[in-house]
Amino acid sequence: MKISIIGIGRLGGALALALSKKGYSIENLIARQGETAEKIAENISPKPQILNASETEKLGGSEIIFITTQDSEIEAVAAGLAGKLTNKPFVFHTSGSLSSQILRDLNESGCRVGSIHPLVSVSDSFLGARRFKDVFFCLEGDAEAVAVAEKIVGDLQGKSFAVETKFKALYHASAVTASGQVTALISIAVEMLAACGLTNEKAQEILLPLVKSTFENLEKQTPAEALTGTFARADVETMKKHIAAIKETLAPELLEVYLQLGLRSTHLAETQGASAENLALMKKILAVENAKNWKGNLQG
């Protein structure tokens, strides 16, 4: 199938390289920075045409168009294409948070539209092109578009799942929680350990094997089954010591994270046979401490 890609950043370049190796014909690369697009094009055979943003009328022969621009530009790109694509191709964007509704102008002009979002970090186009194998892709859009997207992902040796349009933002929140916010959480753990007199670098080095072992457990168990430590044991006294130590040493917002995650942990522990009496007491303490912390933040 003939493909054009609008927006040759890291992901757009990675898709161009990966799809060309799977037999797709990359016809056009549309980019602001011709130098970046040229580097990608030189590694594709036959070499695609490089166009600027004002030449989208030349995309009429494309069967599939990917819009891989920044999220803030997708709607304007779609509006600019509407009416120019007489062959009514499939059009996909690759935003994680936006749904195919952002392509409504193209849909109204007869194009089949959808979104394809790979759950992988692409920091370089050439490295990214080799990372799609076994990666999950979130698909969303009209039925025909999703069917085509499933084939594309299969050809890339990836795995796909579809969500309804109304759930696209929630899906993305899940992905951000599992990636960027996990990183933020680990940074809090590092700060806690560093407050014991270690450097941040040493604290991170010490904690990473523990983090890795947790993820290894999660590969085989549910979150509730993988829960270990203070909350899994419903250890009230140890939790009290944690709270006191954090209060004494660290900022209130870090205590809030501990309290909120502690509450979530008690819910997980309930399903694993921990002491119901102790868990009820832990919940009460967490709620009281959270209220105090909020009051202190407001007064501060």
Where are these regions (language model features)?
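Short, well-ordered alpha-helices that flank and scaffold nucleotide-derived cofactor binding pockets
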Residues: 13, 17, 21, 42, ...
